[in-house]
């Protein structure tokens, strides 16, 4: 019993990074797709949400491994280990993905502010810059203390809990007579292959769930706890963590991530679809509803309170996702380019780049333009995901990167795959301990299969959309 308590106490120290990552999987960009799925196919497409989260867990675990073993996040590994031109190309795609993601957060927050506080969309868009100030105050990932990092994680966690509570309340407001039908929705169904619209919505759920910026985020936010361990044990922090720090953190980081994604991201996305399936099924106006229309539908078919709860959930998720996206923007810029700009400048630039197009659209096109820009952002993200995720699989399958050479507890391995060991490195020492964290062959094949599947399905979805198919992102 005591050993279980010790495990739980140690696990509690790792709670935080998984919650931050889960935010990327429950942003306002997911809502319209899930509502459309519930309205047209009731609970049948819950399986699509479940399998999308399985894919997300696989990719995010690779991120945890990469950041923990190498001491560098995905963007930094690209800079160290890829040709300069390829690195810059990947940076451009990553930056576009950050901006496209941020558009969805800005839109969701602005609409929520309009519903809750009657703030015009234009002012709502401008107010979204405030979440940058939160990051500026609390998040210092390269500092030598976990206190500010934990405060930041706690703050985002409050917003996540708020989102979850809102959807719990929504679930209590709907009636689900046939519980078996609901749980059956988490099992595979052939309707996805029989009806093209079901396939489109399933692909839309997949595209809206697995987000490019979460890969950079997930590989970076594991570093503070590694640094804290080495600082306390060895009195200094190296770029690459010690083997003992890796062993201390890796499995707990995996566990915290998996639990967070399933308890938070899967629950929220499923709850949206369940509420829609229970109340909006068979309603034609719900099949292609934007965020504001969803609010109006919930008010009409459930109650005004249900609509307000949805708006509050959208505000919490929009704010938390916006904070995380802005942080990911800093990770991308500093990792790929090693920017010398102060962190506040990087974060502010990332946020302003997303706000400017939203502001222009709201001023010129109003609510219709906001809906269009949200759809456009989801198309962009679907196309970019396979590009930015390919290096992740390459790095974690590369033995030159994932082998740790340990001597007296301190890692001294090449910083990049092209580095050459000299006579003083443990690579040539008969006494150095070698631990190989490279992906197994099965994991590599599985990762490549998932990558190819997501990439091909996303491309099919986007091409169908461009050809005029009725697709809901």
UniProtKB/Swiss-Prot annotation:
Q: Name one GO biological process term.
A: iron ion transport
Its transmembrane ranges are 14-34, 44-64, 97-117, 119-139, 152-172, 198-218, 257-277, 297-317, 352-372, 373-393, 448-468
Q: Superkingdom, according to UniProt?
A: Eukaryota
Per UniProt, the keywords (alphabetical) are: Endoplasmic reticulum, Glycoprotein, Ion transport, Iron, Iron transport, Membrane, Metal-binding, Transmembrane, Transmembrane helix, Transport, Vacuole
Molecular-function GO terms, alphabetical: cadmium ion transmembrane transporter activity; inorganic cation transmembrane transporter activity; manganese ion transmembrane transporter activity; metal ion binding
InterPro entries tied to this protein = NRAMP_fam
Q: What is this protein called?
A: Iron transporter SMF3
The source organism is Saccharomyces cerevisiae (strain ATCC 204508 / S288c)
């Amino acid at each position: 019993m005591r050993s279980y308590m010790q495990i739980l106490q140690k696990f509690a120290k790792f709670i935080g990074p998984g919650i931050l990552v889960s935010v990327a999987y429950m942003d306002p960009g997911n809502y319209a797709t899930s509502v459309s799925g519930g309205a047209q196919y009731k609970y049948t497409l819950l399986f699509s949400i479940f399998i999308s989260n399985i894919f997300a867990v696989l990719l995010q675990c690779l991120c945890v491994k990469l950041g923990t073993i190498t001491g560098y996040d995905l963007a930094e590994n690209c800079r160290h280990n890829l040709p300069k031109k390829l690195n810059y190309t990947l940076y451009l795609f990553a930056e576009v993905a950050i901006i496209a993601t941020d558009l969805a957060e800005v839109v969701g927050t602005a609409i929520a502010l309009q519903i809750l506080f009657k703030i015009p969309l234009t002012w709502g868009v401008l107010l979204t810059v405030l979440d940058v100030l939160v990051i500026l105050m609390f998040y210092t990932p390269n500092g030598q203390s976990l206190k500010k990092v934990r405060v930041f994680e706690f703050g985002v966690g409050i917003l996540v809990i708020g989102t979850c509570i809102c959807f719990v309340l929504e679930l209590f407001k709907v009636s689900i007579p046939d519980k078996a039908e609901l749980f059956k929705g988490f099992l595979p169904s052939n309707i996805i292959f029989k009806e093209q619209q079901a396939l489109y919505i399933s692909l839309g759920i997949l595209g809206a769930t697995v987000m490019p910026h979460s890969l950079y985020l997930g590989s970076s936010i594991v570093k503070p706890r590694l640094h804290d361990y080495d600082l306390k044990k060895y009195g200094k922090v190296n770029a690459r963590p010690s083997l003992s720090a890796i062993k201390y953190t890796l499995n707990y980081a995996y566990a915290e991530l998996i639990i967070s994604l399933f308890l938070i991201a899967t629950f929220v996305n499923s709850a949206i679809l369940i509420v829609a399936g229970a109340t909006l099924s068979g309603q034609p106006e719900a099949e292609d509803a934007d965020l504001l229309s969803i609010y109006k539908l919930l008010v009409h078919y459930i109650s005004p309170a249900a609509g307000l709860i949805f708006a509050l959930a959208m505000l919490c998720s929009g704010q938390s996702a916006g904070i995380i996206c802005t942080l990911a923007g800093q990770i991308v810029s500093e990792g790929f380019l090693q920017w010398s700009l102060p962190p506040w400048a990087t974060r502010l630039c990332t946020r302003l780049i997303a706000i400017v197009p939203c502001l222009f659209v709201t001023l010129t096109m109003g609510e219709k333009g906001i809906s269009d820009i949200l759809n456009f952002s989801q198309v962009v993200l679907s196309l970019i995901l396979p590009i930015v995720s390919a290096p992740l699989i390459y790095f974690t399958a590369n033995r030159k990167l994932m082998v740790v050479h340990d001597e007296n507890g301190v890692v001294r391995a090449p910083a990049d795959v092209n580095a050459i060991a000299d006579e003083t490195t443990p690579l040539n020492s008969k006494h150095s301990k070698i631990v190989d964290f490279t992906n197994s062959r099965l994991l590599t094949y599985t990762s490549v299969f998932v990558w190819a599947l997501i990439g091909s399905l996303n491309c099919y979805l986007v091409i169908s959309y461009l050809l005029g198919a009725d697709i809901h992102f």
